[in-house]
C-alpha cells in the first residue's frame, strides 16, 4: 500500500512544483543523475519499503508499516518522501489519498492515477459534493492569461511550434475577454447560465482553430517525453493550458451543468481583478468521471441525510 500527498507538504527541500521539476531533469539522459540528491535515492527507499511485506511473509517482522517506519527509512536512505510514495503506489493494492486526487479531474490526470476496476472508498462522504464541484471548475485572471500567452509566444527552441499553439489558445481567451470588456463597461460581472453556456464556450474559442484534444496531446508530450525542454517560465503555462483544456472539454459536453462568469472585478484566488470563471454547478460531472471507470464506490459518513438529495446531486442511486 501507499499514501499520496502533495509535493508542497513532502519535499525535503521545500521546493515549489516548478523548482522541483527543474531539479529532477535528467542529466546526460540518465534519469537517476539529476540535480536533486533526494530524488536520485528515492528508488532505494522504494526497494527498502518493499522488504516489509517480503520479510513479514517470512515471519521476521510485521508486513504492515506506519509513517514512523516510513520516516526512518527516508532518513536512513536520505531519499525524497514524495517520489518514494509515488513509486510505491505503482505496485500498491491499496492507496490512501485526499479526495481531490480522485475527484479533481486535473489532479488525477497529472498524478497518473489509474482507477480502472478499482474499489474506491470515500470516508466522510458528506463532503463529496463540494469537492466534486470544485474539481470540475476553473477560474483565470486576464493578467494570468495574457502573461502565459506571452511567455509561450516568446519561447525559442526545439518546442517552439508546440508552445506557439498553446500561446494561441491563451490568446483566444484573452481576445474574448477584452472584446467583452470593450462592449460592456459595467463593473458588474456577467453571468451566463446553463442554457447559453455552450454557445458562449464556442465564442471563447472562436479565434483558436485547433481542437481541444490537440492541446492535451501537446501538453502530454511536453510534460513527459519533452519535459527536459521546458523552463521554469514555460512549465507552469504548459500545465495550466492542459488544465483549462480539460475543463473546457467538460463544459462543452456537460454545458447545462455549468455557469460561466466574467467581469472586471472577479474574485480570483483572493484578488479582485478582470477574469473568467467556469463554475460547475452539478457534482455529478466529476463523480461520473470516477464512477465510470471504478469497479465500485463506497461512501461512508454519519450524516448522509437526506439520501434522496445526495443521490440527486451525484446523479446516482445508492
Where are these regions (language model features)?
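A substrate-engagement module of RecA-like helicase motors
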Residues: 1-93, 103, 150, 157, ...
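Structured core elements
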Residues: 3, 121, 298-299
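Generic hydrophobic, helix-prone segments enriched in Leu/Val/Ile
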Residues: 20-30, 163-166, 170-173, 245-251
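Signature of the SF2 helicase/ATPase Hel1-core->accessory helical subdomain module
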Residues: 65, 75-94, 98-216, 302-316
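A contiguous, basic/glycine-rich beta-loop/short-helix subdomain that forms a polymer-engagement track
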Residues: 70-92, 103-112, 215-318
Amino acid at each position: 500500500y501507499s499514501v499520496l500527498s502533495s509535493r508542497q507538504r513532502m519535499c525535503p527541500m521545500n521546493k515549489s512544483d516548478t523548482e522541483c521539476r527543474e531539479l529532477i531533469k535528467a542529466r546526460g539522459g540518465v534519469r537517476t543523475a539529476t540535480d536533486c540528491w533526494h530524488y536520485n535515492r528515492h528508488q532505494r527507499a522504494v526497494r527498502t519499503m518493499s522488504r516489509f511485506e517480503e520479510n513479514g511473509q517470512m515471519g521476521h517482522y510485521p508486513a504492515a508499516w506506519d509513517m514512523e517506519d516510513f520516516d526512518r527509512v527516508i532518513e536512513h536512505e536520505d531519499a525524497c518522501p514524495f517520489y518514494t510514495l509515488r513509486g510505491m503506489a505503482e505496485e500498491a493494492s491499496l492507496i490512501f489519498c485526499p479526495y481531490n486526487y480522485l475527484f479533481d479531474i486535473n489532479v488525477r490526470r497529472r498524478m497518473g492515477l489509474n482507477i480502472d476496476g478499482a474499489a474506491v472508498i470515500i470516508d466522510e462522504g458528506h463532503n463529496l459534493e463540494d469537492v466534486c464541484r470544485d474539481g470540475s471548475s476553473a477560474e483565470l485572471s486576464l493578467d494570468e492569461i495574457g502573461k502565459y500567452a506571452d511567455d509561450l509566444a516568446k519561447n525559442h527552441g526545439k518546442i517552439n511550434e508546440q508552445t506557439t499553439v498553446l500561446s494561441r489558445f491563451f490568446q483566444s481567451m484573452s481576445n474574448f475577454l477584452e472584446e467583452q470588456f470593450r462592449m460592456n463597461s459595467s463593473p458588474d460581472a456577467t453571468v451566463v447560465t446553463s442554457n447559453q453556456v455552450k454557445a458562449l464556450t464556442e465564442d471563447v474559442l472562436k479565434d483558436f482553430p485547433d481542437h481541444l484534444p490537440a492541446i492535451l496531446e501537446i501538453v502530454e508530450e511536453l510534460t513527459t517525453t519533452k519535459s527536459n525542454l521546458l523552463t521554469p517560465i514555460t512549465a507552469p503555462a504548459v500545465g495550466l493550458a492542459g488544465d483549462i483544456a480539460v475543463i473546457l472539454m467538460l463544459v462543452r459536453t456537460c454545458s447545462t451543468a455549468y455557469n460561466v462568469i466574467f467581469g472586471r472585478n472577479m474574485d480570483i484566488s483572493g484578488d479582485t481583478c478582470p477574469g473568467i470563471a467556469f463554475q460547475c454547478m452539478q457534482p455529478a460531472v466529476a463523480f461520473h468521471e470516477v464512477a465510470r471507470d471504478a469497479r465500485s464506490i463506497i461512501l461512508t459518513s454519519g450524516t448522509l441525510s437526506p439520501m434522496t438529495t445526495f443521490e440527486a446531486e451525484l446523479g446516482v442511486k445508492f
